[in-house]
Amino acid sequence: MIEKLFILLQHAAPKLALTVFAGFVANAQRGAWTHGLIRWFIRRYGVNMLEAAQPDVTQYASFNEFFTRALRPDARPLAEADFVCPVDGAISQLGRIAGEQIFQAKGHSYSTRALLGGNAELAAQFEDGDFATIYLSPKDYHRIHMPSAGRLRRMVHVPGELFSVNPATARGVPGLFARNERVVCVFDLPAKGDESAKQFALVLVGATIVGSMATTWHGVVNPPRSATVREWHYDAEPVDFAQGQEMGRFLLGSTVVMLWPKDTVHFSQEWLASKPVRLGEKMGDRVFV
């Protein structure tokens, strides 16, 4: 009953107005007031500041500067694996893409085409492939890193809703991740042997009070919030990334969805839905057929 009421409130709430206001507060530089807000947040959510590159709260000029804080260089060593976890969070779902359909929660799925902004050609690459969805909670580190080496080929900003993203909305809002505002980043995988070229996608999904999403090569992608899909291509000047290198961040956080083509990734046996995960842990290895 409580969960149904929460979902109803999600539909009724002025989500964009709340998000704009939250972004204003998060970017405000109010000295002692800002530091008090940060201290409250640390206590409320149990944030481990011992892992932060800058543990002194008074050194953060704004809440967003704290929220997107860097970690100590030794805080997240990379496992020896072809694919490592790109974020701190919890696995929402993972597994095989059934044709175009990605499992969201019991009774709900959404299509790769919808997730990727309606691009049928791009979605076709991931038909019968694999996916993993990771939810970032408020206490988590909110920078996003590369699960493997890759060469950036395109970025797509898809306008959409701003529902909260959590287990309750995953169960109660059909097509949640393909309805919310999102930024799609597509990379080439390094070729190995005679294997044909493959790509993978990292999708940054927005939510209520997620003020914006940013990438390291573009900066803040939203705002501005366009009414239509915007797309950038990098074939002329491709950007190469190493495994574990930072590629983006949430200014207030949400969810990452990863997509791979068929016969590309074999997930670690330890990767299970609802399990907490950390940046750099082994996610899986390449499949060669």
Predicted regions span which residues?
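Contiguous, well-folded functional domains in the mature portion of proteins
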Residues: 1-289
